[in-house]
Each structure stands twice: as structure tokens, then as C-alpha cells.
Regions:
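Basic, helix-initiating cap at the start of DNA-binding domains
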Residues: 1-49, 55, 66
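C-terminal peripheral helix-coil segments that are non-catalytic and often amphipathic
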Residues: 1-13, 143-150, 167, 172, ...
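Short amphipathic alpha-helical segment with a characteristic S/N-K-E followed by hydrophobic residues
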Residues: 25, 40, 63-68, 78-79, ...
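Amphipathic alpha-helical segments used for helix-helix packing
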Residues: 66, 71-72, 104-131
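Hydrophobic alpha-helical connector segments
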Residues: 80-109, 162
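Amphipathic alpha-helical packing segments from all-alpha helical-bundle domains
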Residues: 110, 123-151, 167
Length: 211
């Protein structure tokens, strides 16, 4: 998985980073966000919950936006993987089920919805969400395609990389699951995940063979 780097470009210098402290801070951030909401969350409250000094947070994050986005991103980095289940269809079904289960966790759902709501009027936050959460998970598309090509399920690439194609595949998978779980509040069970996987396998063949 891609390493998580929660600091901003102007990170202050200080003592060496502690992975344990980072994990505690990010977990405390998600907990506080679920209880207090975006407007009620403060770095002081997060520091108290994590058992660290508030200055520790300011050495790592420029402010609340950066901290909350990285707290959400950490869940995806730690929990979301593309399983190798022997076929492209099975791999897609597996990652869909894992993604849905992750989104259905109260801490994920609350934190992600808070980020999205706040980002509707904060362009910088929206860009940070894209960079820290969305773009970092697009490697799952690349991994799945390489596996499928090695199995002979998809043809090898015959030209330069096509980021637009990868974005389309990612958007179809992620958008379908996010809408199902967080908008329509419908279950993502084995049957639904299988139907989506079958649809995607047919569509992927068209994407790879089309213009």
C-alpha cells in the first residue's frame, strides 16, 4: 500500500515522528469527529483523547482540515486492499465487498461524510481529499489490471499509460459503492457485488478494446 504522509508542505521541525503517536492521533480524530461533528472538533480535544500534547499535532499537521483528511485516508490505507482471488471478476467482487464494509463502519461513514460536506465550500479541502484519499487508492486499478493481464483475462497494454481510462474504472467502482452505501443506504451483499463485478468485467473488455 502507499505510505501515508500526514504532514503539510510546511511541516515544522521537531522531534522524530512516532508511528504509534500518529496512529493514536488519527484514531482519536475519527472518534472525536463521530461524537462532535466537524464544527465541534478541535485539535485540543484530539490531543487530549490521544494522550499527547497539542504541540505534537501542530508539528505534524497545519490545521484541522489536514488532520481530518489524513485520519480518513489512514483507514483506507490500512483496510482497503485488492484480494487475489484467482480471477478478475472475483477480485472485483472481493474489493467491492471490502470497500462497502469499510464505508459502513460508523467512524468511516461519519468522517467521510463530514469531509465531503465541508469540502463543498472549501476548494483546498476538496483537493486534499482527492490527493490523500482518492488518488492514493487508484493503484488498486493498476494492480487488478496487471493481474488480469498476467492471467490472460485482459490483453496487454499496447501503448502509453492511459490515466483517463484508469480514472474511469476507479470512478465506476468507487462511485457505485459509495452511492449504494452512503446515499441510497442499500446493502452491498455478495449478490450485488457479483452483479457489479460481472458488469465491470464486460465493460473492461470494451474499455481495453475501444478507442
Amino acid at each position: 500500500m502507499c505510505p501515508l504522509s500526514p504532514a503539510s508542505h510546511n511541516r515544522r521541525t521537531g522531534r522524530p515522528r512516532s508511528a504509534d503517536a500518529d496512529r493514536a492521533i488519527l484514531a482519536a480524530t475519527r472518534e472525536a469527529l463521530a461524537e462532535l461533528g466537524w464544527s465541534g472538533l478541535t485539535l485540543g480535544d484530539v490531543a487530549a483523547r490521544a494522550g499527547v500534547a497539542k504541540t505534537t499535532l501542530y508539528r505534524r499537521w497545519a490545521g484541522k482540515n489536514e488532520l481530518v483528511v489524513d485520519a480518513v485516508a489512514a483507514l483506507f490505507e490500512e483496510q482497503l486492499e485488492l484480494p487475489d482471488l484467482g480471477s478478475l471478476q472475483a477480485d472485483i467482487q472481493g474489493v467491492v465487498l471490502r470497500f462497502a464494509a469499510l464505508l459502513d463502519r460508523p467512524e468511516t461513514k461519519t468522517a467521510l461524510m463530514a469531509c465531503i460536506a465541508e469540502a463543498t465550500h472549501d476548494d483546498a479541502l476538496r483537493l486534499r481529499i482527492r490527493d490523500a484519499i482518492v488518488d492514493r487508492q487508484k493503484h488498486l486499478v493498476l494492480t487488478g489490471r496487471v493481474r488480469a493481464q498476467q492471467r490472460g483475462e485482459l490483453p496487454p497494454d499496447d501503448g502509453p499509460a492511459d490515466p483517463a481510462r484508469d480514472d474511469l474504472i476507479f470512478d465506476v467502482v468507487a462511485g457505485s459503492v459509495v452511492h449504494r452505501v452512503m446515499v441510497s443506504s442499500q446493502p452491498v451483499d455478495d449478490a450485488w457485488a457479483l452483479r457489479l463485478a460481472r458488469l465491470l468485467v464486460v465493460g473492461l473488455a470494451g474499455v481495453h478494446n475501444g478507442p
